[in-house]
């Protein structure tokens, strides 16, 4: 049942054979694998098999060991150097403080042009104050919606209303009087329509 797969020229040497997975699972004798031009004999293993990377030779382990030793030595040598660094002379310390003082950023007086970037005041566009000539403090404006007055006559009418009082309250024209009869209300709603032309042939 084991099927053999022939490896192409790109993957390995021509003529080398690689056993399929079925052959490895069934344990059909030793098989030859072509890996990077090397031939390795693998014995059949039962159960699940996982391809583990090959063990590194001892030479590479020695190289890694020497690298680790070198880094340990360098870490050890850095310790005493750090202890020697704080011993500076007084002249060097004073030079550093002078440099730090000279590197302080300049004050705001050195850049007066920054204030001129915004030539207008944004609050000017949000002012809702009226000039002193038009006083509206004595007008009954509670609950009045915003009105746009086209003519000055309407503005004069508003000024003539006088101070608000609970006794003299003018009834607004859009509210209907409750004492009126329904017929009088309906008479105000009648609209004259044009006469119907009956002469048109359908």
Curated annotation (Swiss-Prot):
Task: Tell me the GO molecular function terms.
Answer: SH3 domain binding
- Motif TEK-box 2, residue range(s) on this chain: 94-96
- PTM-bearing positions, type N-acetylalanine: 2
Where does the record say this protein resides? Cytoplasm; Nucleus
GO BP, sorted A to Z: cell division; chromosome organization; DNA repair; homologous chromosome segregation
Motif segment (SH3-binding): 163-173
Q: Which InterPro entries match?
A: Securin_separation_inhibitor
Span of the annotated motif D-box: 61-64
Q: Which UniProt keywords apply?
A: Acetylation, Cell cycle, Cell division, Chromosome partition, Cytoplasm, DNA damage, DNA repair, Mitosis, Nucleus, Phosphoprotein, Proto-oncogene, Repeat, SH3-binding, Ubl conjugation
What post-translational modification information does the record give?
A: Phosphorylated at Ser-165 by CDK1 during mitosis.
Q: Where is this motif: TEK-box 1?
A: 71-73
Its main localization is: cytoplasm
Q: Provide GO CC annotations from the record.
A: cytoplasm; nucleus
Please list where the region (Disordered) is annotated: 1-92
* Positions of post-translational Phosphoserine modification: 165
Q: What does this protein do?
A: Regulatory protein, which plays a central role in chromosome stability, in the p53/TP53 pathway, and DNA repair. Probably acts by blocking the action of key proteins. During the mitosis, it blocks Separase/ESPL1 function, preventing the proteolysis of the cohesin complex and the subsequent segregation of the chromosomes. At the onset of anaphase, it is ubiquitinated, conducting to its destruction and to the liberation of ESPL1. Its function is however not limited to a blocking activity, since it is required to activate ESPL1.
Q: What is known of its domains?
A: The N-terminal destruction box (D-box) acts as a recognition signal for degradation via the ubiquitin-proteasome pathway. The TEK-boxes are required for 'Lys-11'-linked ubiquitination and facilitate the transfer of the first ubiquitin and ubiquitin chain nucleation. TEK-boxes may direct a catalytically competent orientation of the UBE2C/UBCH10-ubiquitin thioester with the acceptor lysine residue.
Q: How does it assemble?
A: Interacts with RPS10 and DNAJA1. Interacts with the caspase-like ESPL1, and prevents its protease activity probably by covering its active site. Interacts with TP53 and blocks its activity probably by blocking its binding to DNA. Interacts with the Ku 70 kDa subunit of ds-DNA kinase. Interacts with PTTG1IP.
Q: Which family does it belong to?
A: Belongs to the securin family.
Report the protein name in the record.
Securin
């Amino acid at each position: 049942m084991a099927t053999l797969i022939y490896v192409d020229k790109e993957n390995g040497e021509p003529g080398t054979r690689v056993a399929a997975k079925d052959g490895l699972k069934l344990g059909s004798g030793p098989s030859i694998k072509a890996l990077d031009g090397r031939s390795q004999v693998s014995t059949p293993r039962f159960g699940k098999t996982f391809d583990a990377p090959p063990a590194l030779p001892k030479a590479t382990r020695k190289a890694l060991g020497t690298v680790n030793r070198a880094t340990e030595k360098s870490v050890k040598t850095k310790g005493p150097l750090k202890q020697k660094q704080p011993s500076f002379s007084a002249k060097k310390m004073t030079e550093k403080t002078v440099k730090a003082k000279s590197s302080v950023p300049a004050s705001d007086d050195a850049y007066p042009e920054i204030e001129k970037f915004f030539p207008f005041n944004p609050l000017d566009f949000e002012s809702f104050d009226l000039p002193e000539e038009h006083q509206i403090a004595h007008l009954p404006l509670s609950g009045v919606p915003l009105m746009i007055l086209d003519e000055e006559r309407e503005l004069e009418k508003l000024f003539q209303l006088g101070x608000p009082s609970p006794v003299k309250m003018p009834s607004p024209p859009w509210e209907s009087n409750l004492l009126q009869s329904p017929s009088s209300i309906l008479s105000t709603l009648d609209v004259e329509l044009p006469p119907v032309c009956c002469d048109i042939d359908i």
